[in-house]
Amino acid sequence: MVIAIFGESCTGKSTLAEDLKEALKAQVYTGKDFLRLAKSEAQARSAFQALLSQAAEGQETVIYVISEPEHLELLPRNCLRVLVTAPLEEICRRFAQRTGGKLPDPVRAMLERRHGCFDDEPCDLHLVSGQTSPEDNCAAVLALCRGK
C-alpha cells in the first residue's frame, strides 16, 4: 500500500507520517528522498515510481510525504491520498517556530503565494490541522487503510 500525505509546509504531514509509520511498520519517504535511489534524477524518479508501484500492489506499506505539487505525478493511481491543510496564520506561526521565532517578510510572502496550492488536488481524505488531534488524524487514515 502507498499512502501519499501531501500539503503545504508546516501543516502536520510529518507528524502524521511518523504516527502511521509506527502503526503500519511503514517505510517513509519525504520530498526528494528518492534521489538517493540512483545517480541521476531521471533514474531516481523512475526507480522510485517502480518502488511505489510495487508497494501499491504488494504487502509493503510506503508513506510518501509531499510538499511540492510536482511530486504528485510520481504517485501510482491506486494509492491512498491524504491532503493535510492548515489556515495560513497557523502555517506562518509554525514556520516562525522553525526559524527561531520570527518570520521574515519574504518568507511570509512566499507562504502566502503558495497557500492553497494543493486545495484542488483529488484526495481520499482531507485533514485540517488543528481541527482534530494527531491521534484522531492517524485513526482516520488507519480506518481508510483497512477499507482498501
Kindly label every feature range from the protein language model.
Residues V2:
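Walker A (P-loop) ATP-phosphate-binding motif of ABC ATPase nucleotide-binding domains
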Residues I5:
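Hydrophobic anchor at the beta1->P-loop junction of P-loop NTPases
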Residues S9:
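The conserved Walker
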Residues G12:
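Conserved glycine(s) of the Walker
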Residues T15-E57:
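Conserved substrate/cofactor phosphate-moiety recognition/catalytic segment
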Residues E57-I63:
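Loop/turn-to-beta-strand initiation segments
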Residues R77-A96:
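Conserved phosphate-donor/acceptor-positioning beta-strand/loop module used by diverse small-molecule
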Residues G100-K148:
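Small-molecule kinase domains that catalyze NTP-dependent phosphoryl transfer to phosphate-bearing small molecules
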